[in-house]
């Protein structure tokens, strides 16, 4: 009887240890917010060495993302998950984010960061320089694309073809006769690539990303 009792006690202790281990793993996983929000950190913009920019008539305006930290990243969110992910990233204790500055609009911030950040719940724009921008200034890419359709052409085919990347609502500006699309994308690189692709269409006069540009820069833009 005593031997049987010892065996059962051993089994019970093993089961308890297993449950404790599972509980510990679950708790660790539950608090791993990098995993929960799929946050990735990079020493440089992953698209640093790829061509980035936009077309102005027949001229390609090349944009170069920052190569060294601190990085000035614009983060935009449109969901509760995005806001939670942002607050987690900002609150990390290992000094990834040096400063946070709220921007006009209520759902966008400027992050001064030691790392380039990627998160599917956030739109992240790098800060870019170009040949004709004043030193120390940066261009940031908004998650919107402005399109000027050719006379008599509709923007609906664009909305249909790129439904996975553009929001269904189309905002038409009467004054300039342009169409503004909101993007369902995560990086400024993706917005630039899509704007360039749309710009090549036969029914489009021109297409550009919406940009935040310092008022005294020499960068050419139509808006």
Features from the language model and the residues they span:
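Bacterial Sec-dependent N-terminal signal peptides
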Residues: 2-6, 15-40
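Compositionally biased regions
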Residues: 5, 21-25, 41, 78-80, ...
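A short, compositionally biased domain-edge/stem linker segment
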Residues: 18-19, 56-63, 124-135
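Short Lys/Arg-enriched alpha/beta "domain-start" segment
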Residues: 30-83
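Short small/polar-residue motifs
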Residues: 50, 55-62, 92-98, 163-169
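Short amphipathic alpha-helix segments
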Residues: 81-91, 150-165
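Autoinhibitory propeptides
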Residues: 94-144, 149-151, 160-162, 168-223
